[in-house]
Amino acid sequence: MSAPPRLSARLSVLDQKKSNAPSPTSPTGLKTSLGMPPNSGSSGGGGGLKSSVGISSLPTIPSTKSTSPTLPKRNSANLSLLQQQQQQHTNKSTSPSSNTPTATSTTSPFSYLGKQASAQNLNTMMSMMMLNKNPLSPVVPQPGASLFYATPTEADDEEFEHIRNLLNSEYSVTTVQSTGALKSSNLVVMSWKNNATSELTEQDDQLENDKRDLQFIKEQLEKNNSMSKQMIYILDRFNEGLSQLEMDVAPINASMNEWSSIFNNINSTMEQVKSVLDKFDVDKIDSKINDGAKGDYVSYMLALEHVGNAIDYIAEKSHFKSSDKVMDALKQLKATGLNELETSFKSLLLKISNLVDPTTIAKLPNSKRYLAIILPNHVEEISKYIELFEKLHYNAFLKEYKDKRSKFILLSLRKMAPEKFIKQTSETKNLAYVKGSHPLISYVQETLRLYQIEYDLASELFGNQYQLILDEIIDPAHELLLETTEPIIKVRKTPGDKIFSIFPLLDLFDTFTKLLPDFITAISSRDGKHISELKTQIKHLQDTCASLLDFSLDEEKEISSSNRKEIISDATVDEISSNMINYFKRLIEYKHSVELLLKGQDNNNSNSNSNAPSSTSSNSKSSSSSSSSSSSNSASSTILPTSFIGFLEKILKNLIKYLQGRAKKDFPTQPATDFFKPPIKSVIFQINNYHYISTSLKQSKILSNQQFENNELASANHILHEFETCLDNEIKVLNSFWKTIADILITNKSNKEKDEVKSIIKKHTNFLKTFNDLNKLKFDIPDQELKLKLKTEAKNIIGRSYDQFKELCRLEKIHLEKNFVPFETTDDINRKLDRVFDSQ
C-alpha cells in the first residue's frame, strides 16, 4: 500500500507585502501560487479546500503523519466534477501562460491523483489550497488573463524563488487541525513533496534503526545482569568474611571489657582516695582561712565551703582512724572563717539597711521592688553569704539579719512622726477636712511599700523559707501601725464637731479597705496574725463610722442651745441646715463606703435580732408594754436605711421636722404682730431655710443624676420637691400676713353713712403705726434674690390696697392732713417696706 503524499504549506510572501503585516502569520489575505486572491468566509465558519487551479471542496486523503491535518472525505458523486477540473487544469497547463511559477508545482500531484483515484475510491485526494469559506459557497472565479501574461518583476522573481525554496523544504503545515476542514481566513501554499516509495523507504530505515536500538538495549541489559550477579557473589563473600572476623574478635572484646572495668574501678578508687586525702589535708587551706579574706571574699568563701564539706564527710565516715585530730582542726578553721564572714555580712547588712524617709522612696518597680533602695550587687553578695551559711549549717546570721531589717523598717517609719498624728487629729477641725489629707493615710501607704520591699527581698534571699523570717521582721512595724491607728479611731471630738468627725474616719476606712488586698499579698495570706489584726482595725473603723451616721438633729440642737439663746431673734439660715448641706456635699464623695457601712449595720441588726431570745412570760410582756414608747424611739434612731439615697431622704425629712419644731418653739409672737398667727419671725425663718436647702440641693452634686441610678432618681426628685413645696407654703403664709395688714384700710361701703371721718382716719393711723412697728422687727433675708421677690410681692399687695384706700378718700372727699402734713404717697409706703426688709 502506497503512503499518502506529504504536504508543504507556507504563507505567500506577496500577500504579506500587500497586507503590510509584521509577521508571516498575520491573519491578512493570501494569494495562491497562481496569484489568486482568497475568498473571505464568515467568521467562525470552516473554510473549504481549494487547489492552485481553483478546485473547491476536494476530498481529503488520510495522512499517516501526526502533523498532517485530516481532511473530510467526499462521496463518489463528485468524481465526474473532479475529472472535469483535472482535465481543465491539464489544458491550462499547456497554454502560453505556463511560465507562471505555479505551473510546475501543480502538474505532478494531479497526475498522481488521476492514477490512484479509481483504486483508492478518491480518498487519496488532498486539498492544495485551504480557504476560510463555507462549503456551500460558490467556487471562486478564475483569475484574469492579465495576471498570467504579465511580465514578472524583480520582486516577483524573489517571491518565486522563496516559494521554490519552500516547496523543496521539509514537509510542514502552517495551520494544524486534528479533524475537519482547515479553519483559516488565509490561503495556504501546498505542494507534493515525495512519493509513496520514498516514504516507505524512510519507514523501512526507521524500522531497521529501531531493531538495531533494541538489539543494543538487549545486549546492555544482559551485561548489567551479569555484573549484578557478580556483585551479589562478591557481597556474599564479604559478609562471610565479616562474620568470621566478628567471631575472632569476640574473645578479644570480652577481654577488653574486663580490663576496662578493672581500670574504671582502679580510677574511681584513686579519685576517692584523693578526695579523702583532700579532706584530711588541712595545711592547704589553713593559711588561707587564718590570714583572713583580705578583700577576696570569693576565694575565702570557697575555702570555707571546702572546710564545711570536709567536716560533713568525716562526720559521716566515723570509721576512719585518727580522724579526731583532723576534725578538731577543721572545726577550728570553720569557726575562724565564720567569724570573718559574719563580720563582713554585718557590714554589708548595714549598707543595705541605712534609714530612709519613706516618702522619698521612688515609685516601686513591678518586680524586685527592693531595687528602689538596694543596689543589685549588694543583693548578690548577701545571697552568696546566706547560701554558704546554709551549707555550713550556720544559722546565727538569721538573728542578725532579722534585727537589722526590722530596725530599718521601724526607724524609717518613725521618721514620719506617727506619735504626732493623734494630736493633729484632735486639733484639726473636721469641718475643714480635705479628703486624703489625714497623715495616717500616708503612713499606711508607706508602711505597705516597705512591706512590699521586704517581701521581695526575703523571697529572693530565702526562697520558700521567707515566710517565718518576714513575719518576725515586720512585727515591730506592724505593732507601731496598730498603736497609731487605735487612738485615732477612738478619739472623741468636741460636741459641736460630732457630725463632721466621720469624714477623716471614712477616709481611713476607704484607705484600709482598698489596701487590704495589697497587705495580704505583701505579708502573705499564711500570716494569719498580722492580717487578722488589720481586719480587726477595719472592723473598728466600720463600727465607729456607722455609729457616727446614726445621729439626731435634736441632740445637735441641745448641744448648741447655749449659743442659740444669744441669737434667738435670728431668723436667717439655721446652723443645722448649713451643716447638713455641707455634710452631704462631702458625704457624697464617700457614697460607696457609706453604702457598705449601711449594709453592714443592717446585717448586724438582723443578726442581733435573730440571736435575741424571745420572752414568753407575763412579766416580760408587762415590762415591754410599759417601755414601748422609749424602745420605739430608740429603735427609730438606730435603724438606718441600706442605701445612700434612703439615708439622705431620712436625714432631710428629719431636718424639715427640726425646722418646723424650732419655728414653733424659738419664735414667740411679737407685740407688733400679735394680730397675726403664726409669728411672722418663724415664717421668715422657715422661708430662709427652705430656700437655702432647695437652692443648695439644685446647685450641688448631692442630687446629681451622675450620683444615682435610674431607680434612685425618683426618690432624689421627691426630696427636692418636698422642700420646694414647704417653701411655697411659707411664702403664701407671708403674703397672707401682708394682706392682713392691707385689710386694716378696708372700709365697709354698705355702712358708709354710719362711718364717720374719724373712723377712716383711725384706720389710716393704725396702718401707719403697724408699719412703724414692723420697722423695729427687721426681716433678715440674706439671699438677695429671695428678698427682692418677697419685697415685690409685699409692695404689690400693700400698694394695691393703699391706692384703693386713697381713691376712696378722694371720692368721699375725706382729707387726712394733720397740721398741714400732706397725704402719704404709695412711694412713701414702699420706702417703709424697704426699711422692713433691710437687715441691721
Curated annotation (Swiss-Prot):
GO terms for cellular component: cytosol; exocyst; Flemming body; plasma membrane. Residues 1-112, 601-638 are annotated as: Disordered. The keyword Cell membrane applies. It is a peripheral membrane protein. Gene3D superfamilies: Exocyst complex component Exo70. Keywords: Cell membrane, Coiled coil, Cytoplasm, Exocytosis, Membrane, Protein transport, Transport. GO terms for molecular function: phosphatidylinositol-4,5-bisphosphate binding. PANTHER family: EXOCYST COMPLEX COMPONENT 7 (PTHR12542:SF41), EXOCYST COMPLEX PROTEIN EXO70 (PTHR12542). This is Exocyst complex component 7. The gene is exoc7.
